[in-house]
Amino acid sequence: MNFVGPAELTRLLLPDLAREQSAQVVLVISGLALAPKRSSPVYCASKPALRSFAKSLRAQVQEAGWPVLIQEGLQLLVDTDTTRGRGKGKISEAAAASQILDGVAKGRAAIDVGATALLRLILRLSPGLGERIMIGR
């Protein structure tokens, strides 16, 4: 469901979207696509799969000349029903949605929500440290 559902829905909608003057697909992906956590190996494995799907699909859509923008909203630490009572420093669902919509409006391919930009920076500067931080969650 974490990978197959969004990928299959996108596949089914893409032919119709390609016939529009312009269209967007925004795949909301956990920041765990960048580095996994210890407690959820299967869940964490599905996140890079969805991110890879988005990147490959973006290249295919561009090559085909379709007017469809494929975007990724990568988010960490969002306060949802699933995460209530766990972790600190979470942003609200409304703040996450606002950041994604801002990135959509700016046409960004990858939209970093909340602490995701910080995680990217840590992973760029010290991949081992970033993974140790995340795997301990």
Task: Map each language-model feature to its residues.
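Flexible, glycine-rich beta-alpha linker
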Residues: 35, 68-87
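Active-site loop immediately N-terminal to the catalytic Tyr-X3-Lys motif
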Residues: 37-42
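Residue(s) in the substrate-gating loop at a strand-loop-helix junction
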Residues: 30
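A short helix-coil junction within the Rossmann-fold of NAD(P)-dependent oxidoreductases
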Residues: 12-21
